[in-house]
Swiss-Prot record:
The gene is rplB. Residues 35-54, 223-273 are annotated as: Disordered. SMART domains: Ribosomal_L2 (SM01383), Ribosomal_L2_C (SM01382). Keywords: Ribonucleoprotein, Ribosomal protein, RNA-binding, rRNA-binding. Part of the 50S ribosomal subunit. Forms a bridge to the 30S subunit in the 70S ribosome. Pfam families: Ribosomal_L2, Ribosomal_L2_C. One of its GO terms (biological process) is cytoplasmic translation. It comes from Stutzerimonas stutzeri (strain A1501) (Pseudomonas stutzeri). The keyword Hydrolase does not apply. This is Large ribosomal subunit protein uL2. The keyword Mitochondrion does not apply. PROSITE patterns: RIBOSOMAL_L2 (PS00467). Belongs to the universal ribosomal protein uL2 family.
Amino acid sequence: MAIVKCKPTSAGRRFVVKVVNQELHKGAPYAPLLEKKSKTGGRNNNGRITTRHIGGGHKQHYRLVDFRRNKDGIPAIVERIEYDPNRTAHIALLKYADGERRYIIAPKGVSAGDQLVSGINAPIKAGNSLPLRNIPLGSTVHGIELKPGKGAQLVRSAGASAQLVAREGSYVTLRLRSGEMRKVLAECRATLGEVSNSEHSLRSLGKAGAKRWKGIRPTVRGVAMNPVDHPHGGGEGRTSGGRHPVSPWGFPTKGAKTRTNKRTDNMIVRRRK
């Protein structure tokens, strides 16, 4: 994997920084694991905008990724590593010994030809999936379940990882990349290693149009709007908004805590930094 800075042959190329991975599959994805992905433009079934800054972009297919890793004891060979437009991480196409193929989040260091396996007796090796109670303390993991059998919900983006720091009774304690310490049921599964494509954060799209290709529309500042559109709008000349930063609906933003899920507060040993 290499970081490539483009030569400034035009204004749109001047600030482009690419991450080039020669191991990525250059052909079409595996068709039986594709699904149609419709565009919403950020609207709900009433036609109202529920998520701003969404619209346009290149057509995409959704890749059906296996987050459960529940084919226990059946070895699989990594056929290839692929690009996935729906996530920052790369995905790996596995071919199991019984002939079935599945996509998984590609772990760092795993390449075509490697053998992976799931289950309580799986070797301690990057890419293998085990219950947290069977993983040694100090191990780096990703793709962590919050409920046994539901599938991975934590630590799925490019370069992400968590560390298993303690085991007590039916729970284990994980240190997440944010600094949060969280308890998770020891029966939940996780995948060893960290997520691939850790250089993703170093890339630069270089121009506004590249953002539009991804289906992301411009973000207008509140102070550039009229008072009818935003609490920071209006004023004579250029103003700073005159109040602490808020959303278009008046809720504090930029650092205000928004967590309200008291039901799982007892699972958090230490809040994130």
